[in-house]
């Protein structure tokens, strides 16, 4: 798989079957996160795996793939050989719909269950009840740390511009983190169906409590004042001829991201920062991935995102932040024999009290989490 895949196996040098029920894996580098991947990776017969495996999966779950109409629906049938309790539903049709279409289908009584966005949670539909599920899903905005002018190679060897003249200033990044009101955002955007995010791994054992920051608009303004960002006639700050203004990109087909972006821009006005929101397709967003703030969505039951978003050469290091201390902790976290021993190391990569370094809001503030 590719390096940006949740099932990244690029570090596996060789897999050797020692007998009918055991396999030994040899790696190119220490990488204990592979254990998380193996926990969810399907194991299939060699003869059944090929280029068309994705369209003809083999598994031991409750259901089997009966039909796949790409872009429209999949039809599942109960697996007669399932080892557990017999499925109560013998046939399941999963229709692929945008969130507004799913809501309309529920209103028309065309579906039994509809997955839609929290922005619609205040709407009632006869004979349906709302089910809210807790997740590890999070939303965060990358804040490019370099000065503009450089380039960085992305997918396909394309050189993308790097750096932002506003978010390059650590005072701006810290002020944004302290100035955003997450509770108000949750109330206004998703009708209270959410919890504040302070990192990509808040609910995980490798999450750091030092990532949590209370909203303090006065302190955020103080940081900007002390850094020389003075308010202009229109209330927007400037420093050395640079206006405190930047574009924020989000996926235009996501109503929650659109609403979060708008609320974020509105809150930043109080700090004297002008944010222009830009809804676009991912094809149009990626050229800006290292030069402009982007609202991303993350969520994993493995520390892979904690590593990749913060490691210097990580595929998710859109902030382009490089720090030897952070890298060292992340590398050490991957190398320890027992994953439980990696938790504290991942936490120190986020904030190390001894060195006063890390990606936390009081440190490099490379992201602002919502």
Specify the residue positions occupied by each region the protein language model found:
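Surface-exposed, Gly/Pro/Thr- and Asp/Glu-enriched linker/hinge segments
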Residues: 1-29, 46-66, 120, 234, ...
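Extracytoplasmic/peripheral linker and loop segments enriched in polar/acidic and small residues
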Residues: 9-18, 165, 170-174, 186, ...
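Gly/Pro-rich hinge or "lid" segments in bacterial periplasmic/extracellular proteins
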Residues: 10, 21, 30-31, 36-87, ...
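Ligand-site clamp/hinge motif
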Residues: 49-51, 80-124, 265, 274-276
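A bilobed periplasmic-binding-protein/Venus flytrap-type ligand-binding module shared by bacterial periplasmic
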Residues: 77-80, 137-172, 179, 188, ...
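Periplasmic binding protein-like
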Residues: 106-107, 112-116, 123-130, 266-316, ...
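Acidic-aromatic pocket-rim loops
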Residues: 134-136, 140-158, 283-337
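Append "and occasionally in soluble cytosolic enzymes with long acidic Gly/Pro-rich linkers
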Residues: 163-265, 348
């Amino acid at each position: 798989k590719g390096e940006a895949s949740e099932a990244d196996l690029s570090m596996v040098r060789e897999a050797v079957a020692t007998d009918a029920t055991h396999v030994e894996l040899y790696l190119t580098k220490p990488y204990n996160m592979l254990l998380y991947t193996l926990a969810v990776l399907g194991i299939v017969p060699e003869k059944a795996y090929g280029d068309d495996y994705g369209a003809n999966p083999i598994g031991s779950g409750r259901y089997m793939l009966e039909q796949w109409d790409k872009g429209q629906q999949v039809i599942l049938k109960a697996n007669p050989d399932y080892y557990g309790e017999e499925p109560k539903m013998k046939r399941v049709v999963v229709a692929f719909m945008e969130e507004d279409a799913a809501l309309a289908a529920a209103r028309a009584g065309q579906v039994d269950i509809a997955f839609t966005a929290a922005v619609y949670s205040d709407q009632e539909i006869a004979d349906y009840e709302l089910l809210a599920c807790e997740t590890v899903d999070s939303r965060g905005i990358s804040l490019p740390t370099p000065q503009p002018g450089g380039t960085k190679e992305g997918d396909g060897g394309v050189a993308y511009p790097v750096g932002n003249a506003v978010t390059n200033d650590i005072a701006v990044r810290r002020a944004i983190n302290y100035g955003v009101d997450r509770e108000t955002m949750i109330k206004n955007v998703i009708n209270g169906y959410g919890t504040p995010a302070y990192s990509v791994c808040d609910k995980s054992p490798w999450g750091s409590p030092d990532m949590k920051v209370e909203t303090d608009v006065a302190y955020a303004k103080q940081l900007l004042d002390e850094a020389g960002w003075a308010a202009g006639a229109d209330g927007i700050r400037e420093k050395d001829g640079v206006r405190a203004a930047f574009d924020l990109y989000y996926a235009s087909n996501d109503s929650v991201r659109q609403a979060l972006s708008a609320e974020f821009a509105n809150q930043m006005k109080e700090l004297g920062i002008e944010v222009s929101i830009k809804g676009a397709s991912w094809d149009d967003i990626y050229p800006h991935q290292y030069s402009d703030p982007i609202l991303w969505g993350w969520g994993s039951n493995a520390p892979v995102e904690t590593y990749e978003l913060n490691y210097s050469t990580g595929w998710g290091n859109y902030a382009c932040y490089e720090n030897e201390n952070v890298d060292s902790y992340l590398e050490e976290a991957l190398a320890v024999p027992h994953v439980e021993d990696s938790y504290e190391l991942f936490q120190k990569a986020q904030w190390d009290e001894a060195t006063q370094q890390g990606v936390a809001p009081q440190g490099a503030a490379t992201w602002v989490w919502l």
